[in-house]
Amino acid sequence: MDGFEIASELLQASHHLPVLGTGSPSGSDIISGNYMLGYSADDANLSQFEQLEGLLGSPTVANHVDFGKETADLAFLDDSGGILSSVELAGMVSPPLDAVVPMPGITRASRSRPAFSTPASRPGLSSAKSPSLGATSPGSMDRSEEVKQLRKKYHEKYKERNRLAAGRSRQKQADLINLLQAEQQEEERRRKALELEIANMQKELVDMKQELQHHIRISNC
């Protein structure tokens, strides 16, 4: 039903109401709530408002508004004499929360969306990280022990070989020293022998000179 048709029906229904106070309320006052809010203290006014609701066939004006539209047509409520604010009108026109139907696309997307879990809550990651962080397996321990034993044997063999090489080098040096000493002693012996031979030759030369002089004196006589 259009807003102008509702306003005309309200104006026609207001003629059936008796005169109250200084004057009868207009149709816009009834729609905007001035008549209901200004005279709610009187019991007679309450009964008259119930008669008006019976004539209209609806307890509130909000039932005449089509909520299927994107925006409700509230042009017929525009009255300069109204005292209700836009917030109150929105409260009168807005549908109840129970009537709001969630969109199937949004709910389906929210249900189908997987819930993200933190890395700490994932059992797969924790189980995958646990072997590397935990103790090593017996096979790896045996291999590590075997590698350690091989390294130890290699170092011991290398040290033994170095000791033997150092011993051979020291022995060779000692042999060379002994050989040099023997050669030195031999040279010393030969030197002494040569010196003795030279001394003998000098002695013989002196004897030969003396004999030659003796022969010369005899020949001169």
Swiss-Prot record:
Residues 109-146 are annotated as: Disordered. InterPro entries: AP-1, bZIP, bZIP_sf. One of its GO terms (molecular function) is RNA polymerase II cis-regulatory region sequence-specific DNA binding. Residues 127-139 have a biased composition (Polar residues). Induction: Expression is induced by sucrose, glucose and arabinose which repress the gal4 transcription factor, a negative regulator of the ochratoxin gene cluster. GO terms for cellular component: nucleus. SUPFAM superfamilies: Leucine zipper domain. It comes from the Eukaryota. Keywords: DNA-binding, Nucleus, Transcription, Transcription regulation. Residues 152-215 form the bZIP domain. GO terms for biological process: ochratoxin A biosynthetic process; regulation of DNA-templated transcription. Residues 152-192 are annotated as: Basic motif. Disruption phenotype: Leads to the loss of ochratoxin A (OTA) production and the down-regulation of the OTA biosynthetic genes. Produces greater lesions on grape berries and is more tolerant to oxidative stress. This is Transcription factor otaR1. It comes from Aspergillus niger (strain ATCC MYA-4892 / CBS 513.88 / FGSC A1513). The gene is otaR1.
